[in-house]
Amino acid sequence: LAFRDGLGSASGFESFQMREFEILLGLDNDDRIGGMDPLSSFRRMAEGDERSAAMLARLEDALSQPSLYESMMNWVERTPIMGSSYGSEGDAENVRAYIEAHLEAHRAVCEEAAERSTGWGAGDPSKMVARMAAAHDGAVSFLMPEGEISRARAGLLFIESYRELPLLTWPRTLIDAIVELEESMVKWRHSHARMVERIMGRRIGTGGTSGVDYLDATSQYRIFKDLWGIRTILVKPEKRPALKNAEFYGY
């Protein structure tokens, strides 16, 4: 507590490295609690302070550059799907056929799951059917936001579904490494909140936040939402659409 008094008004909001890390990864301001501006504290500190002004300039430069998330999604958007290359003739039709085939497989899996749970006596059958139908609707909305296929998400789905193909093993390894990176960040946020709660309880934060409640809320942040979300709609290998142009993905 004596150490906390020494901090004065200083807070995590003034952590240049954390803000830069979040920006470089691609945390959207709209996803921050209350849509907060991550640079507001630095703008105040930059007034009359040369070092803080330099930090602010560096953060503003980072904001002007493509984030890791944006670069990642631009990259997976160009994934060859069923041997069809991004922008090639007939690519849109080939991607649509793949997505429709996957969604049909997903629908069948959801229906089978609802039937099995009914046989096990797992609660109200009608509620389970509705729950699985909602899960399928979620898959449709994820792959076809506003009715249009997202080729980036289609690319992610293809990589995750056929990860054993030689050409897709290293892209899948990279995707999983980024998920692991964010998982580590989430674990750190949770551990930080528990440390604060253990030492100081639920006092108001030095930056004026609700303290531990605010820290717990930040552990819900997800930057690479699509990389996490795609795992919700995968189907077993035997249920996948039949692979076309398999030789394209070989050694």
How does the language model describe each region?
Residues 2-79, 83-84:
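Extended amphipathic alpha-helical segments with heptad-repeat/coiled-coil character used for oligomerization
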Residues 58, 62-251:
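C-terminal accessory extensions/subdomains outside the catalytic/core fold
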